[in-house]
Amino acid sequence: MSTSKRVVVIATVALSACASQLVSTGKAPTFGTAVSADEVARWDISIPPSGAGLPGGSGTARQGAQVYEQKCLACHGAKGAGKPADPLAGGAGTLASRTPLRTVGSYWPYATTLFDYTRRSMPITNPLSLTDDEVYAVSAYVLYINGIIGEDAPMNAQTLPQVKMPNRDGFISDWPPRSRN
């Protein structure tokens, strides 16, 4: 039997099992557990380009270098050069080339995206483990190694949204999302 036929057979059996439960019990199968409002609030931490919702705290690149060395260096390499993970720095002037290097400094349009992504996803082995001060500091460090801010520039809820990223005008804005009618 071909792979595609096997997939169809397996899907049919699985759907039949779900349908038989619905017929026999009168209820659809349930998966997982309901999420509480508190659980949703802990994960509802998105930060838009405006910086709305950024938490208190602050950090500089000088402070961020220490956080980076302890929690980022193993994956992102010295000064954000990459290996084994993607590089965070470099790539200036490469976006129009045949081999663009898309880094925080060359590609990302908003500094708030750096904070948002770092807070929710890094370090990859322990996401959501950095304090807000650590996220501000490591964000400042990544901006610094890309030549975007000075080493002692404080990053916080007021200053981070004001950072003008080199590729800010390289995108067609869809924020806030437009109607798709």
Q: Which ranges hold each PLM region?
A:
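Bacterial N-terminal signal peptides that target proteins for export
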Residues: 1-9
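N-terminal Sec signal peptide cleavage junction
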Residues: 18-20
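Electrostatic cytochrome c docking/interface patches
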Residues: 30-67, 123-127
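Sequence/structural segment immediately N-terminal to covalent heme-attachment motifs in c-type
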Residues: 44, 56-85, 89
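Sec-exported extracytoplasmic/periplasmic mature domains
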Residues: 48, 69, 73, 77, ...
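Sequence context surrounding c-type heme c attachment/ligation sites in exported
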Residues: 62-70, 81-82, 108-111, 129-132, ...
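Gly/Gly-Pro-rich "capping" loops immediately C-terminal to redox-active cysteine motifs
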Residues: 65, 81-119, 123
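Flexible coil segments in periplasmic/lumen-exposed cytochrome c-class electron-transfer proteins
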Residues: 125, 130-181
